[in-house]
């Protein structure tokens, strides 16, 4: 049984990522990160030689498109506090199934604090290109994103998988957005469970792997 460590980021819903902690895993350290938590997880993977990394909706660089979305979120915050931030975020962070749900939106909004939102915005606005950290670990990597993620569209995840030094798998899940581990919890848990146990890389005839 390995050790699972979580890096939930600053905008995770109050439920967090604790539902991953009981999954069986191979020996070694297994790091599970959401959004900007990917950078902290990669640094730990580099320092401690993690066996695997699960990156959910990873954010490792800021480009002009992401900067424009951050500017809109900051404008919402400055105009109407966390409520304004949440209203702008509703269109960016949620997939089509969740965006219309007042219950899901209220649960996420409840976990926001002005201090936390400002810290997140400052971190994101100061982000450069941190993909180089992917070259610092040979841990196998699983990237999971929502196909309807308007904040960090699937090409961000493709970049992560392409930059990975070790083995990498990438999945996009339909009907989910940026908050994919909560919007598509069952599907994400199934993928992560197979990955942590090593099932995602079973050897096949001819030297291939699943």
Task: Name these PLM-found stretches.
Residues 46, 53-80:
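Flexible "cap/lid" loop of the alpha/beta hydrolase fold
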Residues 64-66, 82-135:
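Conserved alpha/beta-hydrolase catalytic His-Asp/Glu region
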Residues 162-179:
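Catalytic histidine neighborhood in serine/cysteine hydrolases
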Residues 10, 147-149, 175-177:
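Acidic beta-to-alpha connecting loop that harbors the catalytic carboxylate
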Residues 137, 143-145, 149:
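Short beta-strand/loop motif that positions the catalytic acidic residue
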Residues 150-156:
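Conserved alpha/beta-hydrolase "acid-adjacent" motif
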Residues 1-25:
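Conserved HGGG/HGGXW glycine-rich cap/lid loop of the alpha/beta-hydrolase fold
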């Amino acid at each position: 049984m390995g050790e699972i460590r979580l890096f939930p980021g600053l905008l995770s819903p109050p439920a967090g990522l604790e539902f991953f902690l009981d999954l069986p895993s191979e020996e070694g350290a297994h790091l599970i990160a959401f959004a900007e938590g990917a950078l902290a997880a990669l640094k730990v993977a580099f320092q401690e030689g993690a066996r695997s990394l699960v990156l959910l909706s990873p954010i490792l660089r800021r480009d002009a498109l992401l900067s424009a979305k951050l500017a809109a979120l900051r404008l919402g915050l400055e105009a109407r506090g966390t409520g304004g931030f949440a209203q702008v975020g509703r269109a960016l962070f949620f997939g089509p199934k969740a965006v219309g749900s007042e219950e899901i939106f209220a649960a996420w909004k409840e976990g926001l604090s002005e201090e936390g939102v400002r810290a997140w915005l400052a971190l994101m606005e100061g982000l450069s290109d941190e993909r180089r950290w992917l070259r610092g670990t040979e841990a196998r990597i699983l990237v999971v994103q929502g196909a309807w993620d308007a904040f960090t569209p699937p090409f961000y995840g493709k970049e992560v998988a392409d930059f990975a030094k070790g083995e990498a798998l990438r999945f996009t899940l339909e009907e989910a957005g940026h908050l994919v581990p909560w919007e598509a919890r069952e599907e994400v848990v199934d993928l992560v469970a197979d990955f942590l146990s090593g099932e995602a890389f079973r050897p096949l005839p001819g030297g291939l792997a699943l």
